[in-house]
Curated annotation (Swiss-Prot):
Domain Olfactomedin-like: 245-507
Database matches in InterPro entries: Olfac-like_dom, Olfactomedin-like_domain, Quinoprot_gluc/sorb_DH_b-prop
Gene: OLFM4
GO BP: any one term: immune response
Outcome reported for the amino acid change (mutating residue 246 to A): Abolishes secretion. No effect on multimer formation
Localization: Secreted, Extracellular space; Mitochondrion
Expressed in which tissues: Expressed during myeloid lineage development. Much higher expression in bone marrow neutrophils than in peripheral blood neutrophils (at protein level). Strongly expressed in the prostate, small intestine and colon and moderately expressed in the bone marrow and stomach. Overexpressed in some pancreatic cancer tissues.
Coiled-coil portions: 155-234
Name this protein carries in UniProt: Olfactomedin-4
Alphabetical list of Pfam families matching this protein: OLF
Amino acid sequence: MRPGLSFLLALLFFLGQAAGDLGDVGPPIPSPGFSSFPGVDSSSSFSSSSRSGSSSSRSLGSGGSVSQLFSNFTGSVDDRGTCQCSVSLPDTTFPVDRVERLEFTAHVLSQKFEKELSKVREYVQLISVYEKKLLNLTVRIDIMEKDTISYTELDFELIKVEVKEMEKLVIQLKESFGGSSEIVDQLEVEIRNMTLLVEKLETLDKNNVLAIRREIVALKTKLKECEASKDQNTPVVHPPPTPGSCGHGGVVNISKPSVVQLNWRGFSYLYGAWGRDYSPQHPNKGLYWVAPLNTDGRLLEYYRLYNTLDDLLLYINARELRITYGQGSGTAVYNNNMYVNMYNTGNIARVNLTTNTIAVTQTLPNAAYNNRFSYANVAWQDIDFAVDENGLWVIYSTEASTGNMVISKLNDTTLQVLNTWYTKQYKPSASNAFMVCGVLYATRTMNTRTEEIFYYYDTNTGKEGKLDIVMHKMQEKVQSINYNPFDQKLYVYNDGYLLNYDLSVLQKPQ
């Protein structure tokens, strides 16, 4: 027999002996039966005592504790008289492969857990960011609710009802109005246009309700004026002087702001300018332009053009163009050309809007630039272009003027300076400025919701003086003001929002 098998049998004998002593089950196995298993050569001894081995076999079989360790125990004698036996042990091996699979599964689960945990941490950070944004938005909404400007949820059905009521009123006025019906006809056309605009807004942008409601209020006011004139049998009060003319005594009042919309690049783009192109040859066909600066508040890189105000309101049919050299919010558009301060220089440029290329550049003599004399609260606007009934102007300061405002009339084609006026108003004390009929009007900040038109300089007479015209605003800082002579409106860029105002002028006696 093999040494290993001899060892196993000896071990079994020992276990059986111990079981017999402890359990007192059957007689003990005689030691001579196993004295012949010291090694390989002991097989003959085992054969000579085969009967004793059989007896031992029976004794082992009667030991209950030993028999439980084996699944089978058989023996045989070959033709040489050698006893051979086989022992089958139970399947009690340790499941190493299962433990390895379990370890691998645990490792995979641990990796997945770490990955999900990192996602949770990232989501927690994002939630914190959005929570701050939501808080900021809540504060803005609270401010708007307290202000005279309010945003309401768009109720298109209610607007449609209001428009239909105005249509009925116009029909009644046409039937009963005794005098000229020209204004009534104009109102009817405007109401029809309003109906079309409401239908467009209903299917596209639902965030411009304020602009629509303001137009409805304006139309209702006109209808009331028509009714009053009919009842009192008095002539209709005509609007201010013909657009583009200067037959008046200057600006005396300004309306509440009309919020058009947020600029097309979003909340982060606080600085910029916008307005309506004015062309003396085609005053009623001016396109609308919006030019937000990059978030650094300095570089003018992208701007958009819209053919109509409806296109601007609905974000449709826009031409988006790119330049790489504009600086500050002092941009203006006149006769299909955009006028900008060249980046990091005191040069000015005319950009053709059809080709989006520089048509001409010119150095503005002695002009300070790069924040030397910019407006209060607004950086990079040392050079500010303006448009009025007389053409193109530029407002700036020089070292010689000790920072006071300088006004120059420009040739809109060559950018040559035609004439220059020096004021006594320190430019960094003003928040912004604009021109109307050759008169400079400067604004200053009163508080976070109010500006004041406080100063004027008339280039026609050389006179200057103080004013106190209150100008409400939506946000804290006014970045730019552009005037359009055709509709006599101010186009204001207010911390990313596009506002416009109607100007009231002093009527001269006929």
